[in-house]
Amino acid sequence: MNILVIDLTHGGVKIAVSLAKKGEKVYCYDIYNTLKDVDRRMLEVYNVRLIELKDLKEFKGDIKVIYPVHLPLTSEDISKNNENLNYTFITHHEAIAEILNGWGEDIDKIEITGVKGKTSCAFMLKEILIDENPLILSSLGSLIYEDKKEIILQKNISITPANIKETIDLANKLANPICDGKSKNQIYNSAIFESSLGVSGIGDVGLLTNIVEDYPIAQGRSSAGIAKRQVFRCGIVCCEKDSLDKYYKDISHENVNSFSFDDKSANLYVEDVEYCLDETKIHMVFNDVKTKSGKSVSGKMEIETFAPGKHHVMNVLGVAAAALSLNIDKDTITKGLKNYKGIPGRTNKKNMGNITVIEEINPGINTKAIEASINMLDDNENYIISIGGDYGITCEEIDEDAVAELINTLDKDIILTGEVGKSILNKLNRKVKFIKDYNSVYELAIKNSKNLLFIYRSDYRKLSKR
């Protein structure tokens, strides 16, 4: 069977080469014309041929088309180039599952998707699994932990499904520096993979954090909620209950564990919560949580961790559900979450000079996230609130009109910053301060002895500068 991999911008090269190494006859279509010379040479080495869709008219028999879930083409757009072919269509996620068939059967594997909270959940789970030397793909990079020490495998790596395979390959190269084609050593005993639009299905547990926004993809022909249905290919699914009820009622899956802030029909919910900007105490109840061993567990758990707002607590609930699903004991879960202090360059709290700074830095910041971050201050008047960001961070841009409408309703000291802040400034009907350089916002807060809530839609290229 011929294989056509579409989209070389979002991991297609890795998928194509991986399949070619298995002896498959592979072709590629570079739909966005972004192929780099080094990748072009890599394809040539493995006899992977670049084609246009019109070239399909020369093909005969069966063909498997591997496409990303956000592809701006329909199956009809592709098949019309040769209607005599016998087509099979699978996503990049599904292709990775096929490529990795049989991998990691002796370790715990978690795949994380959702609109918000993915990276935070990944690093909370890292704290819980730290003794198992976790291998991690996250939006902050490919990492591995050995004896609780972080080893960076690769920075500036996207969470496209192909990079699950890339992360595994990087870990194998680290353990086996002499490449003889045989994997002799394995450092990691667990794996945590973050993915943006669904999961591959190789996870023992698939964690769907939420669908707080069902934004359109594939030129409006699909959506985030539809793409993330792929999480139900995992053996056990942990899903925020509102999202489960709203988007996935039609799915039949034997091992679904739901979590909710206050819905007692969920498998895991909050009984009581005591918020604090340093460490929030969460009393949770869990009932009939399905686990990897095949048994169900019930009980109560008290968590103390960095979760200053309700949206952070929801992340904790998802992580707790995922950990319980892996038969991890309560003591290990509570100890791991107590060690979680936020993520530098993301959601974290720190002291700078004489002030406290809470940073909410995220490429997917939206109006709801901004509102939730402001609400966690609980009318504390000793805070400056700074809102801003960069453009071109993710496929979906921020709704500036909605953010402006929110700011218009706030009776708080607001500073706008960055490209996004400048654009929002022109949409307001109230006066707020604009500071172009976000570093100057920190300086102003320190000078005036005012604590700072810094909410920023980030460009990862600038993370190292903060």
Regions found by a protein language model. Give the residues of each.
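Active-site regions of enzymes building and remodeling cell-envelope glycoconjugates
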Residues: 24, 39-52, 82-90, 149-155, ...
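ATP-dependent carboxylate-amine ligase
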Residues: 1-35, 44-45, 65, 130-131, ...
